[in-house]
Amino acid sequence: MKIENDNSQLTIEMPKRTALDREDFLVNARNKSAVEFIDNFYKEPIKRGILIGPKGCGKTHLVNVLCKSLEGINWSFLSSENRDIYNIFNANDVLIIEDINNFNSKQKEDFLFHSINLSKELSKALLLTSSLKVSKLNFKTLDLVSRLEAMNTAFIEEPDDTLMEALIIKLFNDRQLLVKPNTVNFLMQRIERSYLGVSEIIELIDKVSLSQKKSVSIKLIKALID
């Protein structure tokens, strides 16, 4: 730990700690249905679904919440690099495949198609995540598309102002940075209304603040984005 002190504010440099527990996820109308989807995922009769939302919206966070809730239940992440997925399915009750929007080859489509079929054949839970809706995925395998369209889906929408403010504060807190309310308000008026946009600007502010040994302030932010 390293402590820096200028004339206006004491700042403490500490490693970034991303809060990924259930209570750390910021819930409002833009993502409430997705949170309920995850909370109830393993309780549903048909345990197959897709969590859809823009980059940086917290899909991995919610997947982490699900995994932590599965006490005594075997689960595993799957990737298209796995060679023996049949044995992986047999050894686990819940399988997770993230970022299917990045599947851009026939080999990866075949892997996903086979995984969906195995989840049905072996009665295993299967959770997929994607930053694009199924209709926007450029898959060539029509049978795969039809299977995806038949799955339960939950959506996370881009943040409104209330969620934006809470997200900014959380991301600063993850980095152990204390920021005044007027600084948060100033930042909100000047950045892209997206999860990824918020994450990227907070990352930049953090790096500049540390490199210049300055506290996060309106003056520092203004120099970066105005």
Features from the language model and the residues they span:
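Conserved AAA+ ATPase "sensor/coupling" helix adjacent to the nucleotide-binding pocket
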Residues: E165-L177
